[in-house]
């Protein structure tokens, strides 16, 4: 199958989203689609699969002009779209999710459960996934759920599979497994459209890459013929000479010290310090316990023993309100469920942790909060029509800036950032890195959890590595390497691991 999208345009009201986009993909290749959030990637794919209709342009499938009335018709013709946010019914079984609205029936019109179980197991086995198909799909890891989505695509005889940020929540092992499946299916003639912000993945898995910017298809390359620097330039419209900004850390006294923090079965004897003006990276494999440690420090989860000191004084943090009172902020890895109230305005989200400071005589000073929010939005260059728009209407990068604004506005002296640039485009990443440097210049202590090793190495002054709930070593950011981090992250011993 060969799909050619030619001169595709699309407007929503007065907003022109696509401006004459060209894109081609064929069976047996992986074609990456890159661009900043808002570049038009999702809109283009939604036009291909029939969710939207283009205003002009044409789609050719094997040379024939084609349009689909919706995703179901596109799927029937061999085009499958696996979205970043998988729409599984978590309490239903794997097999029931796979055959939802496509149930097999006996000649008597009854549900053929045996045939559905056998087919589900068969298509999963083609991917090397041996699963109990009668268990609830919610029991599976995100990586396993993704395998189920790919198996569903194969059931519909997909010739082209669209994958949107497929590795965003996967472990390194699951990413390796996913890439193995993609390569095997490619050899069997399946084509992939691979949407991702992760540069290193593009060079590992893609044969071609198309870059979009501001609703235009800017360039197409064979991956072997292009550099990361060129792709970044094409995406943002300018050169970013140094992807990670230079840091000239000026560390002050210890802002926070953690001693012997323990929660049985989750983490054990965790001890570390972070100084004013420092970025302390936390690295480790997914499931190592990094997020759980920070949730305990912030008062979301309980711990059995250990001590937290701020500015040298022991503090009791029983819940997040205690943490906020002690000037600790926490940007969670799941900003949509925990960091923001998506249906609420930017104003209400940003002012939430600081609202007590704006109450006079029992009433909120609306004028003061409005000025406060506008100042923070300007300072963090939040791209939005104004403070009254909903948080859910913003791109991922701007949502992340709103969460940062919330904690900066609350006067956080210790700021925990859990996967601060996950799902964020390359231009917004650089803006977030610059903000982190600006905060440390103001003596804020930052703890950054990241699964992106280049990010950890590029931004951290020191790097704490966690393995099975324990800190196995702390490395100097200047001398650490991916190899030294992975040695500690897999339980090995690194001779240059320094003091806690």
UniProtKB/Swiss-Prot annotation:
Top EC class of this enzyme: translocase
Protein name (record): Ribose import ATP-binding protein RbsA
SMART domains per the UniProt record, alphabetical: AAA
Pfam families with a match to the protein in the record: ABC_tran
Keywords annotated in UniProt: ATP-binding, Cell membrane, Membrane, Nucleotide-binding, Repeat, Sugar transport, Translocase, Transport
Subcellular location, principal: membrane
GO molecular function: ABC-type D-ribose transporter activity; ATP binding; ATP hydrolysis activity
